């Protein structure tokens, strides 16, 4: 799987107009923005998180702290997609390594946006290791910020959902699969979000649990397939720029030559195997979301702006938790209810032999799938 560093020069005035007023320090010192992957590229048999941090940098290339939240906020996500609410459904987040400040940072995020507290003490939040015990893995600062991104997005899209965080010991697919099985075996879990990916491979049984929506990011390197999004029974989640405007150029997509075509995917994919994506949500780091994490990665912590399909996967998992149409394989319900999605018809993520795999258009396309949520009628 290819990984790339994306550097975009965006005027501070444009950034402020898109995401709220910049701090005085940003307005004075910052000249550009830098988008960078926070997790190391995956080795064989392992995955990397699909989070891209959007840092404002000064003329020396040093990140300028966000003193207040910047990026899309919970109210923006709820309004754009018709989400919000919830009734105690549990969304599980599977990631690698430990974020030691996950619960405290979640508290800061939810308090900032006037969301009800979600804590271990009140039964809303639970963190455990990959086998369901209190033994947690070692800290990894990149994955720690991925974890905060994931739990913040569930909080934004489904503020009354409970959150189960299962931390795999390492980023190997063997350990991540163990964590997914642990999440699936936990009573009350209705959706499991996986904001990571590695090279396309055959489906692992851990990602096949009827009655649970298992979502996965399609990747952040443009056209090309990643697992577990390529697995037939996983809902592959692509990405857009903004909420419904255009396909994001970094979203993964394609046609698997390894995994079989799910029965519910139609001829529109022009693919004899599993085609990515199924659906999509905001992912472009230049139209990113607000996240809070106090575990510093490369010297950066606090209020952050993130993009990548790591953003879109937990949003879609939350949509399934809210919609509740989980019988059998939830993706099948989505493919049968496309009128409840907003079609994305412009943009592309690269060059491909079959245009629908990499270019957005009317109906299904690779970068954005069937579209973005328009309420929860497709979920």
Outline where the language-model segments fall.
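Short, surface-exposed amphipathic charged segments that create phosphate/polyanion-binding patches used
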Residues: 180-181, 249-251, 359
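N-terminal hydrophobic or amphipathic segments with adjacent small-residue motifs
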Residues: 7, 213, 232, 302, ...
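Substrate-binding/charge-relay-adjacent region of secreted/lumenal peptidase catalytic domains
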Residues: 25-237, 257-307, 313, 317, ...
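Phosphate/diphosphate-binding glycine-rich loops and adjacent basic-rich segments that engage nucleotide
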Residues: 244-255
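Secretory targeting and sorting signals
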Residues: 1-27
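Ligand-binding/active-site lining segments
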Residues: 240
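An often Trp-containing, charged/polar helix-loop segment at the C-terminal end
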Residues: 317-320, 324-370
């Amino acid at each position: 799987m290819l990984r790339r560093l994306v550097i975009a020069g965006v005027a501070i005035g444009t950034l402020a107009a898109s995401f709220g007023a910049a701090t005085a320090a940003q307005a004075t010192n910052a000249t550009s923005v830098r988008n960078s992957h926070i997790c190391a590229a995956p080795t064989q048999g392992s995955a990397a998180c699909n989070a891209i941090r959007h840092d404002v940098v000064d003329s020396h290339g040093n990140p300028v702290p966000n003193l207040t939240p910047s990026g899309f906020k919970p109210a923006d996500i709820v309004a754009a997609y018709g989400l919000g609410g919830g009734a105690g459904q549990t969304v599980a987040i599977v990631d690698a390594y430990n974020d030691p400040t996950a619960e405290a940072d979640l508290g800061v995020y939810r308090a900032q946006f006037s969301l009800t507290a979600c804590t271990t003490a009140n039964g809303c939040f639970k963190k455990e290791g990959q086998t369901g015990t209190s033994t947690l893995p070692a800290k990894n600062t990149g994955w720690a910020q991925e974890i905060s991104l994931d739990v913040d997005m569930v909080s934004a899209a489904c503020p009354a959902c409970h959150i189960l965080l299962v931390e795999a010991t390492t980023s190997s697919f063997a350990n991540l699969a163990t964590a997914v099985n642990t999440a699936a075996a936990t009573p009350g879990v209705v959706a499991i979000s996986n904001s990571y990916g590695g090279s396309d491979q055959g489906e692992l049984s851990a990602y096949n649990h009827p009655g649970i929506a298992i979502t996965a990011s399609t990747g952040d390197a443009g056209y090309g397939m990643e697992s577990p999004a390529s697995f037939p029974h996983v809902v592959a989640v692509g990405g857009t720029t903004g909420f419904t405007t255009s396909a994001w150029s970094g979203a993964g997509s394609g046609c698997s030559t390894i995994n079989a075509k799910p029965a519910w995917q139609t001829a529109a994919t022009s693919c004899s195997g599993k085609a990515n994506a199924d659906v999509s949500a905001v992912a472009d780091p230049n139209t990113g979301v607000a996240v809070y994490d106090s575990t510093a990665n490369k010297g950066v912590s606090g209020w952050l702006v993130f993009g990548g399909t790591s953003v879109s996967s937990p949003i879609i998992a939350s949509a399934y938790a809210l919609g509740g149409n989980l019988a059998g394989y939830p993706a099948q319900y989505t493919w049968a209810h496309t009128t409840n999605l907003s079609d994305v018809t412009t943009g592309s993520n690269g060059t491909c032999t079959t245009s629908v795999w990499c270019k957005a258009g009317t109906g299904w396309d690779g970068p954005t799938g069937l579209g973005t949520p328009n309420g929860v009628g497709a979920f």
